[in-house]
Design a protein with these regions (language model features):
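Jelly-roll (double-stranded beta-helix
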Residues: 1-30, 41-52, 57, 62-151
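Short amphipathic
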Residues: 32-36
Length: 151
């Protein structure tokens, strides 16, 4: 279980996440993080959250966001939200580091899922196929699903 101040490193997504407020801190109501993406991070698989809404504020750099097939670039000081059920992908396609405030409501087990992804990436496991196609649909069905949104 994640703790306030804990940092995760996902070598595959080129992402570092620091937990500000965890599910345990908020009785499951929210998860708050600061996420930093290294330059030229790979585009992740599109997915959606059936029961969660995400909020982002770009502190530094820029993020590329694909929602329902449309791509938008958000820059420092800009904010955006992703409603539950919206198919999306978020990554740093730019040549500079991106730093973002990221909030997920409700938290559910998102922090645990992020911890597992980070551990798998550090072990050099092919996270995309193994994790998103086999483990995610079963263990984290309430948190994340791949494919088309249905909500």
């Amino acid at each position: 279980m994640a703790t306030k101040g804990q940092t995760l490193v996902n070598t595959r997504s080129k992402q570092v996440i620091e937990f500000l407020t965890t599910s345990g801190d908020s009785n499951g109501n929210l998860l708050e993080m600061v996420s930093s993406w290294q330059p030229n991070a790979p585009e992740p698989s599109e997915h959606y959250h059936p029961f969660q809404k995400e909020y982002f504020k770009v502190y530094e750099g820029e993020l590329t966001v694909k929602q329902n097939g449309e791509t938008t670039i958000y820059r420092a000081t800009e904010m955006f939200e992703i409603d539950k059920g919206i198919v999306h992908a978020v990554w740093n396609a730019s040549g500079k580091t991106a730093k973002v405030y990221w909030k997920v409501k409700p938290a559910l087990r998102t922090e645990n899922m992020l911890e597992i992804r980070a551990k798998l990436s550090q072990k050099g496991m092919f996270v995309t196929k193994f994790f998103t196609r086999l483990l995610l649909p079963i263990k984290y069905r309430k948190e994340l699903r791949t494919g088309k949104g249905s909500f």
